[in-house]
Amino acid sequence: MLTKFETKSARVKGLSFHPKRPWILTSLHNGVIQLWDYRMCTLIDKFDEHDGPVRGIDFHKQQPLFVSGGDDYKIKVWNYKLRRCLFTLLGHLDYIRTTFFHHEYPWILSASDDQTIRVWNWQSRTCVCVLTGHNHYVMCAQFHPSEDLVVSASLDQTVRVWDISGLRKKNLSPGAVESDVRGITGVDLFGTTDAVVKHVLEGHDRGVNWAAFHPTMPLIVSGADDRQVKIWRMNESKAWEVDTCRGHYNNVSCAVFHPRQELILSNSEDKSIRVWDMSKRTGVQTFRRDHDRFWVLAAHPNLNLFAAGHDGGMIVFKLERERPAYAVHGNMLHYVKDRFLRQLDFNSSKDVAVMQLRSGSKFPVFNMSYNPAENAVLLCTRASNLENSTYDLYTIPKDADSQNPDAPEGKRSSGLTAVWVARNRFAVLDRMHSLLIKNLKNEITKKIQVPNCDEIFYAGTGNLLLRDADSITLFDVQQKRTLASVKISKVKYVIWSADMSHVALLAKHAIVICNRKLDALCNIHENIRVKSGAWDESGVFIYTTSNHIKYAVTTGDHGIIRTLDLPIYVTRVKGNNVYCLDRECRPRVLTIDPTEFKFKLALINRKYDEVLHMVRNAKLVGQSIIAYLQKKGYPEVALHFVKDEKTRFSLALECGNIEIALEAAKALDDKNCWEKLGEVALLQGNHQIVEMCYQRTKNFDKLSFLYLITGNLEKLRKMMKIAEIRKDMSGHYQNALYLGDVSERVRILKNCGQKSLAYLSAATHGLDEEAESLKETFDPEKETIPDIDPNAKLLQPPAPIMPLDTNWPLLTVSKGFFEGSIASKGKGGALAADIDIDTVGTEGWGEDAELQLDEDGFVEAPEGLGEDVLGKGQEEGGGWDVEEDLELPPELDVPSGVSGSAEDGFFVPPTKGTSPTQIWCNNSQLPVDHILAGSFETAMRLLHDQVGVIQFGPYKQLFLQTYARGRTTYQALPCLPSMYSYPNRNWKDAGLKNGVPAVGLKLNDLIQRLQLCYQLTTVGKFEEAVEKFRSILLSVPLLVVDNKQEIAEAQQLITICREYIVGLCMEIERKKLPKETLDQQKRICEMAAYFTHSNLQPVHMILVLRTALNLFFKLKNFKTAATFARRLLELGPKPEVAQQTRKILSACEKNPTDACQLNYDMHNPFDICAASYRPIYRGKPVEKCPLSGACYSPEFKGQICRVTTVTEIGKDVIGLRISPLQFR
């Protein structure tokens, strides 16, 4: 039995497969109906309206309906698309056992413990017929799949067959519906002529639990409490018992016919499912469960799937694997179908049977290995008991008759797997898991000791792949040695590329692609089962899951090509065609669209001409392609796909394409876009576009400064005029300062009432007339005339020597492949050199009316950007004598490769490589590696996600100390700055993909520092000890360890620090408490008692217990003091301490009572709240610190941990990560 899906739930009493979708309904004993997707292994929906167990359940064959019947006497019809009950049918007077839809008519058949069977019309929602005759509970009733018959099983020990042809004729006759509706109130409880008993089958000795028709033959199967499964045959006149299947040793719950084979399946309360051969009446297979009784069986109407419900849930299973055995060589496919070996020519599609296989094995062929040199095949058969597995060696006849193929004598031997390893040798893995090499006569030529393995696969001539529990090993048969290995668990299939350079290892939910040396190139995980695969001619691996055809590129990129209705097994991929076999062993050809993976492959292989061709001609659309191109560093290619202006804008900025970004910004006309474009243009020195952006965003201050630094005084004067119009005094004065216009500054100061400043400006700069006129306006009695500084110096902005009209010159580099293609495809004419406000159309700044101003008084931006004075696209010609041919001497001939565009000869700077610190960040998820790389932000993010750090202040010193160890410096040459080197801890293997930094802090260092903390605790320097313990605790997340033992030691170190910090902080707090009142003394004693429950070193625990003992003795709590004394003596203190303790103990035992009631129960386990220092007894809600594990009462959730001072209490985190092992 192959289990495909299993659920855990309450007892399952009913099951029904959906005829088309991969769904199954389960009705449970607790009243819930579950809808499962058994292919995706997910619960789709739950329906909970029945009161009590639900026993009957059935899907409708065409409509989105299902029916259920329960112990609440109700039949409910549900619509699973609407996810609700449509209506309820009432009429039964006791539990309903089964409910089934008719395959053709709108009928529902229900069987009940009220000893009746009812037929309901679900369209009119009425009962149309009641079948009476049984005199005990009716356990099951089902329609015949094609005839007007009903079979029922009852605890009255009979199986009855009912003829309902009268009901059909009545419902098809004219006026049937009207009479049906009129007569519904008068339905005869004791039956009508609509349904009559045709046969009564008696033979069971106990009550019958189930009866079912055969899908095509006139047979009935029944299962009963007499532990027997009976087969009955019927004709028009009679029915009789054919045979009985005995073997169950408890009540048989259910029995069904196999829809396509001569088999019967039954299950029982004896916790087993049995498969019976109908012709031999013998048991074929038995499947048992340890603790669960079986209650119901269901067969899928179209697929070879079955489901069984038991006490703990249900299972969906197959009796045997349906994967066809096949082998591909060149253009030929050999496969096994119906005990024939067939050969398919991929080119001509000629499919012929070449050989008949010997019969005898009841198990299908498991796998095949083909030898083209000798035209021989090895067919392996797996038994349920692996030790009984066999293989057959056949030589295929050369002149095969496709109509009547020969049945050559094969050589059969025992063995798990047989694989060809040479022209005339094959390897066999025998039942003892040792390797045998055999010749074509099936004779052993040698035995080879191999590493422990449970399966072998072909790996080229003379080589094998050996599978063990968690790896695959490449083994050389000739040299008897291991060549390479790769970690992957439970590989099921191995598929080599045509040139044997790559191999795909397929497991149940994973694919690992390796090269010939078994170096893993990529690892792909699938949620659904991987079924098969084949290599494309271009080196892409095409594989199938249960419901998809997918692709995988050796770099790790993978995706979906198309969806499948049913699983297929890929045999070959060529061009747009996928050749495959289905589960019926029929060869099929599916058409796929390879554009997506060929596009990615061309990008990876840098075949940019192919990429550009596909970009322009293929229908490659979607966000995934754009995201992929961005991720891989090709934003300029992504520009080809994008129509959305916002996305085009961000992509154009990313690849530095200012022209396309400008077009997109004009289309969007968004302030944020103009600001971003201005920033990027400024970085490129394109001040003309910067000017436009500042104009569009009305950023006057930046625009004025831009005009100042480019020396454009004319436009700066216009900006001053605009500021005056806008009544912006500050901007007006600032522009006057930029221009060095003193008289304008004096005027501005005078107009805004700053007479003193205006006078000083005029007098200092020598504007005597203006100064005198201002001086006269001062009132000598009220105002004082300011004094002029005799040492004043002239501060004048430097006059521009050469105004900057053109953009900042950029280094000319040869354009990338795609940028060039975009340029050739794009509009002609680059951005013009001059973006001038004068083009608005004014002769000067005399009158406001002549300015084209917006509501803010700002000049509208020019529209004519990018056009020359003479217009677009005009070429030289006319009067220019440039077309004349000159006769040049032959020695001046220049090779054609040297000439060309101006771009070709320019220097192309090499692309900047990845820095060592960036490599460290890329290769590691450990916080300390990011700190050593100087990437504090990512290190903080990792610490936040892993251990919940939210307060990074205490980490500042640790970060800086760690970062200082991240690099070394050395003097290279005199007069040159020092050089840096970046030490790696894996320096032998360090590189772009696996380099990680050397770490200075070791676990042993922290353990040594722990000893100092112990010493400080012993001498009573508690505050200093807490500080040192906390320093160790915060340092643990910055460790890197190599093995699981060290991970455990680091966790133990955290526990030690936590115990001491909580205990010592509580002791410090206790010593600060006043001792005047009794309540205060009780609180002091409680805290001392709690401290004795910290996990401390014995030397410290002795001190803690002595303190608690003294305090409790003084409080006259002798009973509790006695427990402390006994614990103290168990630790073996010094003799003088032990003597004193025994005296106190004897005094306490004379009067074993407690004078005061304290909040302390030594017998009830508890944790100490690290904030309130009160006990949290086991079973009470508790929140924990994600790093230290310190416990807190729920009210402290979300606060800073008192132990670490950096983490958030109760935060949900990934967990401490200090080793690469924790990421595997």
From Swiss-Prot:
Top-level lineage group: Eukaryota
Chief site of localization: cytoplasm
Keywords on record: Cytoplasm, Cytoplasmic vesicle, ER-Golgi transport, Golgi apparatus, Hormone, Membrane, Methylation, Phosphoprotein, Protein transport, Repeat, Secreted, Transport, WD repeat
Annotated GO MF terms: hormone activity; mRNA binding; structural molecule activity
Modified residues (Phosphothreonine): 185, 591
Topology of this chain in the membrane: Peripheral membrane protein
Pfam families assigned to the protein according to its UniProt record, in alphabetical order: B-prop_COPA_B_2nd, COPI_C, TPR_COPA_B, WD40
Omega-N-methylarginine found at: 965
PROSITE patterns: WD_REPEATS_1 (PS00678), WD_REPEATS_2 (PS50082), WD_REPEATS_REGION (PS50294)
GO terms, biological process: endoplasmic reticulum to Golgi vesicle-mediated transport; intracellular protein transport; pancreatic juice secretion; protein localization to axon; protein localization to cell leading edge
Location of the protein in the cell: Cytoplasm; Golgi apparatus membrane; Cytoplasmic vesicle, COPI-coated vesicle membrane
UniProt xrefs under SMART domains: WD40 (SM00320)
Modified residues (Phosphoserine): 173, 402, 1193
Spans of repeat WD: 7-37, 49-79, 91-121, 133-163, 203-233, 247-277
GO cellular component: axon; COPI vesicle coat; COPI-coated vesicle; cytoplasm; extracellular space; Golgi apparatus; Golgi membrane; growth cone
Biological role: The coatomer is a cytosolic protein complex that binds to dilysine motifs and reversibly associates with Golgi non-clathrin-coated vesicles, which further mediate biosynthetic protein transport from the ER, via the Golgi up to the trans Golgi network. Coatomer complex is required for budding from Golgi membranes, and is essential for the retrograde Golgi-to-ER transport of dilysine-tagged proteins.
Known partners and oligomeric status: Oligomeric complex that consists of at least the alpha, beta, beta', gamma, delta, epsilon and zeta subunits. Interacts with SCYL1. Interacts with JAGN1. Interacts with TMEM41B. Interacts with SVEP1. Probably interacts with PEX11A.
Protein name: Coatomer subunit alpha
Species of the source: Mus musculus
